[in-house]
Amino acid sequence: MPDTSARSPICTVDVVLLTLQQGALHVALLRRERAPFAGALALPGGYIHVGEDADAHASAARVLREKAGLQSPYLEQLATFSGAVRDPRGWSLAVAYCALVPPELLTTAPLTLTPVAELPALPFDHRAMVDAAVARVRSKSQYS
């Protein structure tokens, strides 16, 4: 049996950008350009570039800049999502970040603001990331 313990997982970052608009919590989504799930709405995310990104936070900031045209707001590390079945390409881990930002920051095309209460099916485990970010924001609002 081959030794598979040294195989590297797919390493990515995903960013949950939340905002209040018309009294409802919204999340910023992008349409995926590549497989898997090409054409689906998803959280802004991408690979960690080992030779370019100093750390996962820098990777998240780069992804927001490149894919959404955003200068990184204050980003808080949310959680790490990992496993053999979260990505059809193979074993992967994603470091998720979140931020609560003013809606005017998210007026950049190609972002789509979607009410959290009306989210479509999302690829990977992006729904779990949104749920975790919403829980974090609600928890913080109770002691702020």
Task: Please provide the spans of the model-predicted regions.
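Residue-level signal for short segments within beta-strands and strand-turn junctions
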Residues: 17-19, 31-32, 101
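Conserved Nudix-box catalytic region and its N-terminal flanking loop in Nudix hydrolases
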Residues: 24-72, 82, 144
